[in-house]
């Protein structure tokens, strides 16, 4: 190897400048340098591959691929060429070619550990588990190292996970993997913790829980040291699987004696105690209670154990919360069994009060007590809050001054009480004026609290931020219940003000995004969402807050950008996850590999991914098709085929985080599982409608063909008639989806404001756009029938088409009428928004586009017939040949279309003029006593909404003007 390395040194030196150019992004210079080198050294394959990388990065993919394949055909075995080709194939998203590369290299250099290892990893990237198993064993035979052997074992497990037949998995793959590991155990060759983890994983998947437990408790279990309590946690999991409740109880008791603050073991302890009571288990008369020691099998034992932990905690210098919370948890469980009074554990209200006295100054106090407030009787809630307020250190209130805390500890305590007040529903039961008084008080406390955070960094949150958030939540209540927009404008004002003091507060930003979107203002949202700096999976979990409104508010450029941003994450997921899997193999983190695979599948099947993909393609068609390029070219560039459905309907995963907003609402007002279920149902229905619409549009260009009337046999031969069959089937499915959607919308489901976002489906139906689009697709079907049958003897079809054209025009006028009205209205100094007008306008523009694509197809059918008749007239010089009325009807329809679009363009100009004429000075909040600071933010908020509306109208108007131009080209 040394000699070979020495021979390659001059080549490395020659290649170095090309590598440098590529690393610096100077691809053109890299290509030039490679060309120079290849003139002198024609056989320097690596230079050719590096040139191909340069070509790939400058957009010359085909040329790059040809060069790469020339080198690959030579089956190189030098490191430089192999690594360069690997990089190139990765950039081309062709990882399967890397496997062929190393398969050839391994044949030529069969004893190379490095090449065998690269081959294994190449298989891992493409998920070739069987070949991975073989490659792992081949590697182990060359270099008998344990990791290689266990790579092969893990590949068997992956075959079992990916096998569709569960029986095959449990009778072939897993037993074989088990035998392979047992062989190593018998030969005493198990060396690493990862190998024990793998053995445990196999036994667990086979359902051999007792054997898995024996492994963990035995000598091999001693190797499990990398994680704290790893061995105990695995034992606990197996005890639960085997329903060994005495062992579960004894182990959790023992672990709690070691650390009385470990909450997970309290839950296991209680679970096991009540299971043992249920089973009437009694300890044996002699010997140990269980493998893990003493067992508690009665409520008395549990009560004494918890009381002992509290006594022990009170004598410790370290404050622990676990025992106190465990007492409340035990009360809850005893109550559910109907036997609390016997054990006299105390009054939950008093226990929570004592807990507050100990931990009220900690931010965790609220989240700790939140779980147990249902133990309080409704009648005692106000008394409980007053009791808590009684121990909060506040200044003495005066007529013009609130009772305020003197330090951060006092502020945290008071904040905890305020949060509990909202959670117990005391704010919700107030009338409007009381709620507005609460908002005023909370904002005064917020302003006062800012004094404690003057030294905070910009990346830190202010101590009093929750006061501001709570005030906004109360204002949202006023807005939603009374329908008064003054409250929502004030909420936006407070959030914008809060953001200046806490620029990193994600909750402020999320609420601003949500409210601006509901008001129909997308412009400020893009920067707000961007400043959240969402990382990785968050693009899927919270991305819906942005992409739901991206296409619906008329800001097409920003919508495209938002969709691209989301899609970039999903597309990189496949590549990134492969790298994680490879790292897991390298470092022996075998238990993580199935998790990575499941994670990748979860993202590939993401509901959000399918939605964004569909909306992005519809958006591209809307902006480009028949404007900059033809509809056919647009569809071809997207690789769309009407017969292909790329949505994994059966495996769709809802990865949205519907609890992303902090909420202090009582349980009955919060987001429930039922809300989440209904939201998923609604989202899936809407996705189906959008997906079918896209597929129907994608089928239009394929219907255009040279017409040979009444020659249906020929049509069937060239496959065109099957195209119309596909479209008719899709139209049928669309009508079913629409009916299902309408039934759902009739339920009038109201989601909590801080919960799921409703889809656009309701607006799609109410605006009349749905009916318009469906009818236009029916027109396609009729027009195709006319096309294949000819003009003669098709009077019925022609009449049907004429009626459809007239009806479609009337429907479109109806849709346009829903776009009337101003986006912003000012009456008596109050501002009222009408975002529905904007959403209807955007749907109207989309519907116009769909109708124009359909009309373009109609034109392509009718024009040849008209020309044919005109030719006959000229040829025979006969005036008796009558032109069928369908041509006049179509021309009238096109004229009508132009009028409707022209009116819409004028209407948008009118909306723009009205918006520009609005003077912001007139737009003041109802509350005249607001501070100068608040007034400033109020102007900012209203300015942002006004500017956003204007931007939306400009983009929508511009697109409509382009569509008007395409209408003028519709001539037969």
Curated annotation (Swiss-Prot):
User: In which ranges do the TPR repeats occur?
Assistant: 11-44, 45-78, 79-112, 114-146
The lineage's top-level taxon is: Eukaryota
Pfam families from the UniProt entry: NatB_MDM20
Biological function: Non-catalytic subunit of the NatB complex which catalyzes acetylation of the N-terminal methionine residues of peptides beginning with Met-Asp, Met-Glu, Met-Asn and Met-Gln. May play a role in normal cell-cycle progression.
The record's listing under PANTHER family reads: N-ALPHA-ACETYLTRANSFERASE 25, NATB AUXILIARY SUBUNIT, N-TERMINAL ACETYLTRANSFERASE-RELATED
Give the record's family classification: Belongs to the MDM20/NAA25 family.
Identification of the protein by name = N-alpha-acetyltransferase 25, NatB auxiliary subunit
* Organism per entry: Mus musculus
- Give the source lineage, highest ranks first: Eukaryota, Metazoa, Chordata, Craniata, Vertebrata
Name of encoding gene: Naa25
